Amino acid sequence: MASKENIADNMEKFSLKSPSKKILTDSTNNVRKMSIGHEANGQLAKESSTVNGIGKSANSLMEKSVTPFDPSLEPLLRENPRRFVIFPIQYHDIWQMYKKAEASFWTVEEVDLSKDLTDWHRLKDDERHFISHVLAFFAASDGIVNENLVERFSQEVQITEARCFYGFQIAMENVHSEMYSVLIDTYIRDPHQREYLFNAIETMPAVKRKADWALSWISSKSANFGERIIAFAAVEGIFFSGSFASIFWLKKRGLMPGLTFSNELISRDEGLHCDFAVLMFQHLVQRPKRERIIEIIRDAVAIEQEFLTDALPVNLIGMNCDLMSQYIEFVADRLLVELGVGKIYNTKNPFNFMEMISLDGKTNFFEKKVGEYQRMGVVSNPLDNVFTLDADF
């Protein structure tokens, strides 16, 4: 493990040189004026004011982190001279999560988009606007998750099993980001609009708001490891949930088979990543207080609700905004239960088509049809692979 001094040096370098730090310090007044699609000046001004508000909210949330935290007391974080070798496995539950992630590997080339363009051209303008902007958010968000994994979690966590998972998660987030980029490249033929969507963090205040919240946790020097685990569980478990649900709504209508299949694969992966965050939280000795956890989750819920009911309302594709807001609260409650906090919203799932989707911190989705898409034998016991002559034919 690197010394504490080296970690401090690395964090100082991050604060000066990281691309995410540059994004965080950009003034929202410098958001470029765009005239593409539905981005009218009035809406842009409205969203910009909202972004300014969340910037202050996120910063104030960071400043509230005053709970003493000693990394040397945490088995996950203390120096581990055996971190360069994998065996013998010390944390079998963490290792099994890594093997499950490894078994679920897939590539962009395995998703067939040949039938999507026909549906794309049949969609209404509002529907195309909504889908393209959701894809723009996704394309940027996976890069932000990786920024956190590379700059913070992978450097802080010292147990080999967790490092294996984070390494594989980084690879899968790259696949997700590539998938969303390919989808945008396939559906959007206008090069100027493509550029606008690929730069969503700078061009779309609604996306910037969510990005700034996540990035502020990466760059924070006051938030402890436990709080940041909660924040990124919220990013992958709450920030993605409504957008996943909106794309599954299209599947319910029999539209865009390539988009909806990739959404199944990615939502399964993100469900597993959220599960892993919960598992890491359970291994912590110094956990954030219940009130602090609720505060972080409530903040994430408010941002996601605003995103899909105001900035990019789901009624553009025929969904009910009130039900979407309720669904986000339902997802947050399921995450809070996994964290041992208990429900605070007590809302039911309003979308029956989402019953089996792993956005709630559970891995049951991994077991259903799309979850069977896994590498053969990766999660099985090697001792089960025995040659025999007494098999029935």
From Swiss-Prot:
Similarity section: Belongs to the ribonucleoside diphosphate reductase small chain family.
GO cellular component terms given for this protein: cytosol; ribonucleoside-diphosphate reductase complex
Entry protein name: Ribonucleoside-diphosphate reductase subunit M2
Gene: RnrS
SUPFAM superfamilies, sorted: Ferritin-like
Top-level class of the enzyme under EC nomenclature: oxidoreductase
Source organism phylogeny: Eukaryota, Metazoa, Ecdysozoa, Arthropoda, Hexapoda
EC nos: 1.17.4.1
Catalytic activity: a 2'-deoxyribonucleoside 5'-diphosphate + [thioredoxin]-disulfide + H2O = a ribonucleoside 5'-diphosphate + [thioredoxin]-dithiol
Residues that, per the record, bind Fe cation 1: 142, 173, 176
Function: Provides the precursors necessary for DNA synthesis. Catalyzes the biosynthesis of deoxyribonucleotides from the corresponding ribonucleotides.
Record organism: Drosophila melanogaster
Any GO MF annotation of the entry: metal ion binding
Signal peptide interval: none
InterPro entries xref list: Ferritin-like_SF (IPR009078), RNR-like (IPR012348), RNR_small (IPR033909), RNR_small_AS (IPR030475), RNR_small_fam (IPR000358)
GO BP, sorted A to Z: deoxyribonucleotide biosynthetic process
